[in-house]
């Protein structure tokens, strides 16, 4: 008998959020640090994400990405806070990929999420694991 090898699960993403001005981008870093402190106090701590202002993306764009793995809900929370603080009004979205260090049936997938920044409401979202199971069971692929 050989015990199963533990697998590591990861969530990857990389996206931009345009906050309108370089001043907003600088203030967004403060919002990020506050959210990171909140995540660190959770049990278990949130994986969070990395944030920076990169010259190649312009001074108003925030580069949001995972650090080995990340938490899409933390990204959504952060973007919603930025939208409220900086009065952003467009739609914004990102996609993410779920992967695993070992071949596992539940180890791969992904999703996407679209927000209306003016209202902070979700426009639509999809998570491929749930979607695939539903369609394979005869459900509506567009539901």
Map each language-model feature to its residues.
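Short, extreme N-terminal segment that most often corresponds to the first beta-strand
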Residues: 3-35
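Glycine- and charge-rich intrinsically disordered segments
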Residues: 1-3, 143
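Charged interaction segments
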Residues: 32-143
């Amino acid at each position: 008998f050989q015990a199963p090898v533990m697998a590591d699960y990861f969530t990857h993403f990389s996206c931009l959020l345009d906050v309108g001005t370089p001043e907003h981008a600088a203030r967004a870093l403060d919002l990020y640090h506050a959210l990171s402190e909140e995540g660190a106090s959770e049990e278990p701590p949130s994986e969070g994400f990395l944030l920076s202002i990169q010259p190649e993306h312009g001074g108003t764009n925030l580069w949001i990405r995972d650090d080995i793995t990340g938490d899409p809900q933390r990204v959504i929370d952060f973007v919603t806070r930025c939208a409220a603080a900086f009065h952003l009004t467009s739609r914004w979205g990102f996609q993410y990929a779920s992967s695993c260090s070992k071949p596992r049936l539940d180890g791969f997938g992904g999703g996407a999420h679209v927000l209306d920044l003016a209202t902070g409401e979700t426009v639509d979202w999809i998570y491929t694991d749930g979607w695939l199971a539903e369609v394979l069971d005869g459900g509506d692929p567009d539901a």
